[in-house]
């Protein structure tokens, strides 16, 4: 899977811009084949789009590279990461402050996995290790309450997942979008301010498969990784991820 390179933020000057906040990076062997998390997030937003997506700006917040203002871009995406939102590293605390500012300024925020967790934490929720342990591979989540701009979702959504932390306490004002027995707060909507998913709509099945194969028996428990791998079928984004991509473009456009 190839992805266009995402230029550094200072190189992008557009009337409408989407800032992607890079909070982690895949292993080089994976990135060389599938792109990095910024490219995956941009690929999700562009998937199935009838017109070209506005250019996006990369901010490597994991390296301390932050925008000078939460209004620097018209919308924000927070990527996944191998880090835990519970670490409270200085860059994470700075990111939490930026996300609060973005929400207050009316700049839409999209959180993906780690982004889901750090956004919830920033807005008054709680993130903890999940009592259910690692969740790996394609997971099904029951849709509870979808806003109008998420029209098209079925009663369940299937997304790739890889996490062992979860949002244990939902922030004030957040609405539950999707849930599962193993992940009660799987997706949240914050009015028109933000939306987040514990799963990875931006991960292709090919990337998830390679990720599980690389880390199974090492970082990831061999039994769960093996079960997830055995159940993986097909390639590309899941059908529900494509529906979500269309909805996220509406979410940004209607800000």
What spans do the regions from the language model cover?
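Flexible, glycine-rich phosphate/dinucleotide-binding loops
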Residues: 27, 65, 85, 118, ...
